[in-house]
UniProtKB/Swiss-Prot annotation:
Catalytic activity: urea + 2 H2O + H(+) = hydrogencarbonate + 2 NH4(+)
Similarity remark: Belongs to the urease beta subunit family.
GO molecular function, one term: urease activity
Identification of the protein by name: Urease subunit beta
Keyword line: Cytoplasm, Hydrolase
Gene source species: Corynebacterium efficiens (strain DSM 44549 / YS-314 / AJ 12310 / JCM 11189 / NBRC 100395)
Assembly information from the UniProt record: Heterotrimer of UreA (gamma), UreB (beta) and UreC (alpha) subunits. Three heterotrimers associate to form the active enzyme.
Domain of life, per lineage: Bacteria
GO BP annotations, alphabetical order: urea catabolic process
Annotated metabolic or biological route of this protein: Nitrogen metabolism; urea degradation; CO(2) and NH(3) from urea (urease route): step 1/1
GO CC terms in record: urease complex
Length: 120
């Protein structure tokens, strides 16, 4: 091996394999592009991007880590979303959930079940 040499596998790396995914239609109704990172809580993206936010709660884009999707003004497209894994704690972003995703998942609700979504 040569110092600094890369030895790559012929086998492709499969991202998010086995994760249950959904597809939803989104439209950027704003006049500026919107960029959404791979691990951004999709339900909290720019309010000028219209889509079913209840279905997107607890989900992120099904794209490789560190990448992003860009929606140009007027763009209508379908995105593929997968659930957050691990402890499923959503903190920050637009501060709409700020706690356990499950505490905010109420069937048919358009707002979090309890204020900030904080758990004790």
């Amino acid at each position: 091996m040569i110092p600094g040499e890369y030895v790559l596998s012929d086998t492709p790396i499969l991202c998010n394999r086995g994760r249950e995914a959904i597809e939803i239609e989104v439209i950027n109704t704003g006049d500026r592009p919107v960029q959404i990172g791979s691990h951004y809580h999709f339900a909290e993206v720019n309010p000028l991007v219209t889509f079913d936010r209840v279905r997107a709660r607890g989900m992120r884009l099904d794209i490789p880590a560190g990448t992003a999707a860009r929606l140009e003004p007027g763009d209508a497209t379908t995105v593929r979303l997968i659930p957050f894994a691990g402890g499923r704690l959503i903190r920050g972003f637009r501060n709409e959930i700020n706690g356990a995703v499950e505490s905010c998942m109420v069937s048919g609700a358009s707002e979090p079940a309890s204020g900030t979504g904080e758990t004790s």
